[in-house]
């Protein structure tokens, strides 16, 4: 009977433990990609610049994803970025990063 009670307690504890509902870093990077692509679509730039930026967007997306994962960005930051609807909102979310996380993000962007 005692063993049965222990099993019930273990099951109850497991049921109470839920996985974080915060979006993963891939979703953060995907939102950045969507916003950057949309902004580029409306930008007044010459075709060569548009092509060059378009070609860089996947690398920028991947660098953001890696910085997010490697820096263990908080659920609050990830949620903020996924909900961002424009570049200014995304930048506001970046202000929630720690100094070290922001430095790592800037460093990864500088290598592109």
Name the predicted role of every residue range:
Residues 15-16:
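N-terminal Sec signal peptide cleavage junction
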Residues 50-112:
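Compact alpha-helical subdomains of small soluble proteins
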Residues 23-45:
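Post-signal peptide N-terminal segment of mature Sec-exported envelope proteins
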Residues 11-12:
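Repetitive helical segments and hydrophobic/amphipathic motifs
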Residues 1-4:
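Positively charged n-region of N-terminal signal peptides that target proteins for export
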């Amino acid at each position: 009977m005692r063993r049965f009670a222990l099993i019930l307690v273990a099951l109850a504890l497991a049921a109470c433990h839920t996985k974080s509902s915060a979006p993963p870093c891939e979703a953060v990077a995907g939102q950045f990609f969507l916003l950057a692509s949309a902004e580029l679509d409306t930008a007044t730039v010459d075709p060569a610049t548009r092509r060059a930026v378009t070609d860089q967007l996947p690398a920028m997306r991947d660098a953001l994803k890696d910085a997010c994962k490697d820096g263990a960005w908080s659920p609050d930051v990830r949620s903020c970025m996924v909900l961002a609807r424009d570049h200014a909102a995304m930048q506001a979310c970046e202000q929630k990063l720690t100094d070290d996380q922001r430095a790592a993000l800037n460093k990864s962007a500088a290598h592109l």
